[in-house]
């Protein structure tokens, strides 16, 4: 199951507790989690509108039942553990967690945590030679 990231993916849920969330459909102007693909993983955020409960993690999308499992919590309002969400509507969206990000700094140099598995080709700029 590959890790898939897509732009403008936002759904809502009324699921309570700390288990798998049932997705209620895309918000107007956004894509649904179906673009992630059945059985694929993605980075997600669950947040209560106007509230203090939130969670960022890695989850697996399942098209039958349109659910997102909460497999790994990367950060949360519950000291990095699963959040037990109460009643009400929560937003669920695809995100790109800061601690997983690799980006170019203001000088165009790659920054962030860079790790590879298997074969990798790295091209670098060398300054001061």
Q: What do the predicted segments below correspond to?
A:
Residues 53-69:
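Elongated alpha-helical scaffolds
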């Amino acid at each position: 199951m590959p890790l898939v990231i897509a732009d403008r993916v936002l759904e809502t849920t009324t699921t309570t507790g700390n288990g798998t969330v049932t997705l209620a459909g895309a918000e107007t102007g956004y894509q649904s989690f179906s673009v992630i693909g059945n059985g694929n993983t993605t980075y997600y955020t669950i947040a209560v509108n106007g509230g203090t409960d939130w969670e960022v993690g890695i989850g697996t999308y399942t098209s039958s039942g349109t659910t997102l499992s909460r497999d790994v919590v990367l950060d949360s309002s519950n000291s990095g553990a699963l959040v037990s969400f109460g009643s009400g509507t929560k937003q669920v969206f695809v995100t790109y967690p800061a601690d997983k990000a690799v980006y170019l700094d203001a000088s165009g140099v790659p920054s962030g945590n860079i790790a590879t598995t298997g074969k990798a080709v790295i091209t670098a700029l060398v300054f001061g030679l």
